[in-house]
Amino acid sequence: MPELPEVETVKRGLAPAMEGARVARLELRRQDLRFPFPEALADRVSGRTIVGLGRRAKYLLVDLDDGNTLVSHLGMSGSFRIEEGAASAMPGEFHHARTKDEKHDHVVFHLEGQGGPRRVVYNDPRRFGFMDMVRRADLAAHPFFRDLGPEPTGNDLGAAYLAERFRDKAQPLKSALLDQKNIAGLGNIYVCEALWRSHLSPIRAAGTLVTPGGKPKEKLGLLVASIRDVIADAIAAGGSSLRDHIQTDGSLGYFQHSFSVYDREGQACGTPGCGGTVARIVQAGRSTFYCAACQK
């Protein structure tokens, strides 16, 4: 599943090709992805101008000039490919190379704009992705978004906010951080990395980072800073390039080579002077990587 940095990378790669362009035709090559397409989606998008691209959590937002927003989720293996004539480029790559097999091309944006015609192709072998059309004014109240917490790099995420959310919680810290109601867009990879950077165990109770009076402990502030830093580093690196996620220009992001604990089971911990070994455990069906020696 793509995490926030991967979706942000895709958004930034698509923006030069899509923003300001007119959708001459939206071509749907099947009736559904994970869910059926909205009724008359092709007719509603064709002829419209794309006024901007955005992102909320792990969702890509395509704003149209009629006040509607096309909401897209990449699912497990979705990717976008930009084609201009015989040339093609892809924004976001990840461990297993994404396929360019045209039999998995399910949605094609035929665009007109400066620089001539181009196509933006959505490819999704597993078809776990989906698209929906939402009035822009209604986005915040839509079921996809209404319960989401603040963005991990936004001003609303702070130690005081997390103290309020975590107070008296016996829930494991990692599970609390993955709860999208607490923080939007934060996923398994970056939670593992942020916990390592802040020397916090994924299995400790979230409430242990809050004083009896409800104030954040010092380590909670360090955790917030680590979350911000690891997300910013991954975005700057173009995403983690893990498994199925490809950048629009086809380049391999380098953040995966900077992982400190994720997917490093049995390797030495990188904390200076630690001497511990990265371990893998399973929490709520997901792999957790951490160093028990320095993460407490």
Swiss-Prot record:
This protein's superkingdom?
Bacteria
Q: Does the keyword Metal-binding apply?
A: yes
Q: Where does DNA bind?
A: 104, 126, 169
Q: Which cofactor does it need?
A: Zn(2+)
Question: Which residues are catalytic?
Answer: 2 (schiff-base intermediate with dna), 3 (proton donor), 58 (proton donor), 286 (proton donor)
| EC number in record | 3.2.2.23, 4.2.99.18
Q: Name the Gene3D superfamilies for this protein.
A: 1.10.8.50, MutM-like, N-terminal
Q: Please list the GO terms describing molecular function.
A: 8-oxo-7,8-dihydroguanine DNA N-glycosylase activity; class I DNA-(apurinic or apyrimidinic site) endonuclease activity; damaged DNA binding; zinc ion binding
Q: Which GO terms describe its biological process?
A: base-excision repair
Residue ranges annotated as zinc fingers (FPG-type) are: 260-296
Provide the reaction this enzyme catalyses.
Hydrolysis of DNA containing ring-opened 7-methylguanine residues, releasing 2,6-diamino-4-hydroxy-5-(N-methyl)formamidopyrimidine; 2'-deoxyribonucleotide-(2'-deoxyribose 5'-phosphate)-2'-deoxyribonucleotide-DNA = a 3'-end 2'-deoxyribonucleotide-(2,3-dehydro-2,3-deoxyribose 5'-phosphate)-DNA + a 5'-end 5'-phospho-2'-deoxyribonucleoside-DNA + H(+)
Which Pfam families does this entry report, sorted A to Z? Fapy_DNA_glyco (PF01149), H2TH (PF06831), zf-FPG_IleRS (PF06827)
Q: How is the cofactor bound, in the record's words?
A: Binds 1 zinc ion per subunit.
Q: Which UniProt keywords apply?
A: DNA damage, DNA repair, DNA-binding, Glycosidase, Hydrolase, Lyase, Metal-binding, Multifunctional enzyme, Zinc, Zinc-finger
Checking SMART domains in the record gives: Fapy_DNA_glyco, H2TH
InterPro entries linked: DNA_glyclase/AP_lyase_DNA-bd, DNA_glyclase_Znf_dom_DNA_BS, Formamido-pyr_DNA_Glyclase, FPG_cat, MutM-like_N-ter, Ribosomal_uS13-like_H2TH, Znf_DNA_glyclase/AP_lyase, Znf_FPG/IleRS
Family assignment from sequence similarity: Belongs to the FPG family.
Question: Can you state the subunit structure given in the record?
Answer: Monomer.
Question: What HAMAP family does the database record attribute to this sequence?
Answer: Fapy_DNA_glycosyl
Q: What job does the chain carry out?
A: Involved in base excision repair of DNA damaged by oxidation or by mutagenic agents. Acts as a DNA glycosylase that recognizes and removes damaged bases. Has a preference for oxidized purines, such as 7,8-dihydro-8-oxoguanine (8-oxoG). Has AP (apurinic/apyrimidinic) lyase activity and introduces nicks in the DNA strand. Cleaves the DNA backbone by beta-delta elimination to generate a single-strand break at the site of the removed base with both 3'- and 5'-phosphates.
Which protein, by its recorded name, is this? Formamidopyrimidine-DNA glycosylase
What is the scientific name of the source organism? Rhizobium etli (strain CIAT 652)
Q: Which gene encodes it?
A: mutM
